[in-house]
Amino acid sequence: MDFHARQFAVNRPPCGKTRREFFWQFGGGFAAVPLIDLLSRDGFFEQQTHAAQIANRSTFATATPTTHFRPRAKRVVFFFMQGGPSQVDTFDYKSALSKYQGKTYSGGLQIGSNGRKIGLLTPSAFSFHQRGESGLQVSSLYPHLANFADDLCVVRSMYCDTPTHSPGILQMNTGSIVVGRPSLGSWLNYGLGSENESLPGFVVMVDPRGGPRGGAGAWSAGFMPAVYQGTLFRSRGSTLLNLRTPAGISNRSQRRSLDLLETLNQQHLQQRPGYSELSARIQSYELAYKMQTTATEVVDLNRETAATLDAYGLHRPETADYGRKCLLARRLLERGVRFVQLYSGGGAESWDAHDDCISNHRKHAAETDQPIAALIADLQQRGLWEDTLLIWGGEFGRTPTSEGVGKPGRDHNHYGFSMWLAGGGVKGGQAVGATDEVGFRATEDRCHVSDLHATILHLMGLDHEKLTFLHEGLEKRLSGVQPRRVLRQVLA
């Protein structure tokens, strides 16, 4: 069984019933009396009722969604730099690295992954310049993005719980290092719904060179109904497979087939209340039917002007793929899609620069710089900027020490790294928090991944302590059970 099959079979045993459901349905007679009490105390009936209500609820928000307070943003784009970009080579300039070049780091941290030897402190090979009126320092890796320095809020004090890729990607997306939790996009769709009943509310575009380590768990709905999971779009070839109706099948014939299928599925669902996978399947058939018209128009980039295609870099081989992702993202946002995630890096070609960090980061920054800057300019020009939240970052950062010989790279570093936010509700032109003198550890206004999630939810009008989902008798939250905070410095 491949990963995708395992991922969506994890909450359902082969017989189609959980152990508790089996005992409930077959534990009749006097023996059922203590069983009823046991199941009641275990939260089984409450869970079944809640699951049935949620599973049958549409993700389409026909009116203004209910929020906990006034939202500053309505939609999100998450630029995910898979592999872990180096903070000291992108947005966290450290002059002390030149001063201490060639020296051993003595900060007392347990660093390095897979037992690799810790190298010597190494300054960035890229120059940094103060950009915009704010004077925010941006690496020469980003000549286009630097023009929007006054719009960026760089959080330089990020940290997470693991230096390993798969759990790191999961934590950045779901708040947990273990598989089976709902992703950020799922939580937002659960809390706010989608604004377009003919398009998915949560879209993911991975790198054609390979998907993220950990697979579909990064956009899974976890223990939520499956209808909230991300929908995968492709950035090369057909954006969505099987989008067109097969030859010889009329729209009327297809509609009648879908209506019959829905009737049969609804009858089956009535016997299995709370079976979210089936409820999601019913909704997905209807969505797929609507997308045959809607999505065909959305993914048709021939409707864009030559100037727009050129601005996003679609005519240059190195920027064409990420440029297409960013342009598709804008078209999806315009049509009410709530959350779009765009991956950079995949397979052996990611930001995971254990060797030759200079060439690695130069390559991946060049692929993404112009497209991201073009999307920012486009959103501003089209009046979407003020209520669209942009997020940039990876699963962790990299060490300020070198790794390897010849053309050295940098190792994983989860103790301190950088991410940036921009757009709706964000105070741009500033850096929040700080790492130590050499960029190893977050020391000032430290921001855990779950603090970032709390801040994102806040900008979307949701209280991270009040946005909950009942699972196994517990009110689950994206931000987890530990005390978390909203980064007030980020807010405009």
What are these regions (language model features)?
Residues 1-492:
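Ligand-binding pockets and gating/stacking loops
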